[in-house]
Each structure stands twice: as structure tokens, then as C-alpha cells.
Amino acid sequence: MGRSSKDKRDAYYRLAKEQGWRARSAFKLLQLNEQFNLFEGAKRVVDLCAAPGSWSQVLSRELLKNIDTSIAADEKPMIVAVDLQPMAPIDGVCTLQLDITHPNTLSIILSHFGNEPADLVVSDGAPDVTGLHDLDEYIQAQILLAAFNLAVCVLKPGGKFVAKIFRGRDVSLLYSQLRLMFRKVSCAKPRSSRASSIESFVVCEDFNPPSNFQPDLTKPLCVIDPTNAHEIAPFIACGDLDGYDADATYPVEINMKKATLDVIQPPTAPPYKRAIELKHSKMMS
């Protein structure tokens, strides 16, 4: 599919480029915030699996848009974005190229907050899907649990955690694990997420770890007496019903039909970069 046809087919894809977002996923976080007020009172925020940076862009624009420039630097909202892949810089965001499963990552993140806990942790991480749904769901669950394990080590009591999930037949077990640490767990589907996709987001509110919980990245989720561990999370649709439908096709204005918009930020180190270079040099057919 060429860029022009995708511009015409996917309203959010084109809208993201028009508004300067690095990816259409920016609208998912915006719609989640409309529903849950995620950014209210957030001063220290962590974006895990952040590349290419659209969620970090949203955090920067929303948290810093009305900030008085005269206030002290340590009183301004602080945003730390973490990913294994390098990221192009974003205003107001500290980008770290780190592994979220490595024990040292925790101390590095906290050092940027002056060793103070975070108010909000978000994660839009997902694997490269294989088409084998059971395998994709399993890998996605492992990414989520890695993000969750780091989140419970950096969050303050009452903090919030948002992460992508693939809803499968065993998703209620995942909700139960999350519910052990948060008083409220919801499953949300932004309008900008295609209805044909099994993608949704868990929104965990009011972080409330057990009294005997000791944060430790080397012992993931080694807590607790799992009493009342069965949990059915409410499913919430987010986004204005008058907005664009992610599964619909919309016409493009006549004067725009031949116009394509460049991406806001090309990938900094894509795995296919060397293959493209070889193809351009005619060394690979």
C-alpha cells in the first residue's frame, strides 16, 4: 500500500501527520485521557517502550502547555521515555535507550526524578506480530508484565498505570494480577483503535501495593497471598462518537488527492536499514 492510498484510507494516519504526531497512536492516549483524566496532577511520568515517541509527544504537549516558565525547574512536570531503540529528541522529554527488564533501569529512571516516585507510567509496547494469535498474545502479555513490574517499582501510592494488551481467552488472569496492586482496573478501547484489532488498553488506577510488598526487578511479581484473585474488568469505549472511525474509509478533498504528507519522524535505526542501502546500491535484487 502506498503512502497516498494509506492517507486516504486511514483518517487517523493522515491526521497524525497533519498535527505533527510521530504516529497515529497519539490519538489513543489522548482519547484515554479524555475518559480517565490520566494527566490530572501528574508531575513525574514514565513512558515505557516509547519509540517512536508519539505518546511522549502527547505527554510533553499536554503536561507542559500551560506551565509558567518562571517556576523552578524541579517544580515542572518531568517526563522520562525509555526504549531499547534510539529515539529522536522530544522537547521536554528525557529519552533513555535502556532495557526495561534490566535491574539498573529502575535506579536510572528514579535518578531523573530526584529519587521521587512517579505519578503515572504508560506503555504502548507491542511485539512484531507473527499472525499466530496465541503466540502474539503471549509475547504481548510478557511485555506488559515487564512494564508492570517496573511500574510498581517506580509508582507512588495512588499512581496510575496504562498499558497495551491483546485481549485473549486468558485475559481475566491478567486483570487479576493487575488488581492485586491497583484498586481499580479497567479495559479501554479508544475509538482510534481499529475494531478489527484485539488491541485494547488496561487502565490501572490508585496504586495500592500490599503491606508486605518489596519492589524488586529481579523477582517479578513475587508477592502476595492471591486472595480474591478473580477479576472481571469493565470494558470502556473511549473517544467522541462524532469523531473518525478507525475502520472506515473517508474521502480526501479534491485538492488534496494528489498530496501525500511526509512522516513526522522517520525511524532512527530500523532493522531493515542495511537492506535498503544494499538495494539502492544494486547489490541486492
UniProtKB/Swiss-Prot annotation:
Keywords: Cytoplasm, Methyltransferase, S-adenosyl-L-methionine, Transferase, tRNA processing
Active site: residue positions: K164
UniProt-listed SUPFAM superfamilies: S-adenosyl-L-methionine-dependent methyltransferases
Domain of life: Eukaryota
GO CC term, one of those recorded: cytosol
Record-level Gene Ontology MF annotations: S-adenosyl-L-methionine binding; tRNA (cytidine(32)/guanosine(34)-2'-O)-methyltransferase activity; tRNA (guanine) methyltransferase activity; tRNA 2'-O-methyltransferase activity; tRNA methyltransferase activity
Deleted gene: phenotype: Loss of methylation of the 2'-O-ribose of cytidine at position 32 and guanosine at position 34 of the tRNA anticodon loop of tRNA(Phe). Increases occurrence of 1-methylguanosine residue at position 37 in the tRNA anticodon loop of tRNA(Phe) and decreases occurrence of wybutosine at this position. Leads to activation of the general amino acid control (GAAC) response. Slow cell population growth. Abolishes spore germination.
Transmembrane region(s): none
Chain sites annotated for binding S-adenosyl-L-methionine: G53, W55, D83, D99, D124
EC number assigned by the record: 2.1.1.205
Gene Ontology terms: biological process: cytoplasmic translation; tRNA methylation; wobble position ribose methylation
Primary residence: cytoplasm
Catalytic reactions on record: cytidine(32)/guanosine(34) in tRNA + 2 S-adenosyl-L-methionine = 2'-O-methylcytidine(32)/2'-O-methylguanosine(34) in tRNA + 2 S-adenosyl-L-homocysteine + 2 H(+)
Subcellular location: Cytoplasm
Primary role: Methylates the 2'-O-ribose of nucleotides at positions 32 and 34 of the tRNA anticodon loop of substrate tRNAs. Requires trm732 for methylation of the cytidine at position 32 of the anticodon loop of substrate tRNAs. Requires trm734 for methylation of the nucleotide at position 34 of the anticodon loop of substrate tRNAs. Methylates tRNA(Phe).
Family designation: Belongs to the class I-like SAM-binding methyltransferase superfamily. RNA methyltransferase RlmE family. TRM7 subfamily.
Protein name per Swiss-Prot or TrEMBL: tRNA (cytidine(32)/guanosine(34)-2'-O)-methyltransferase
Species assigned in the record: Schizosaccharomyces pombe (strain 972 / ATCC 24843)
Phylogenetic classification of the source organism: Eukaryota, Fungi, Dikarya, Ascomycota, Taphrinomycotina
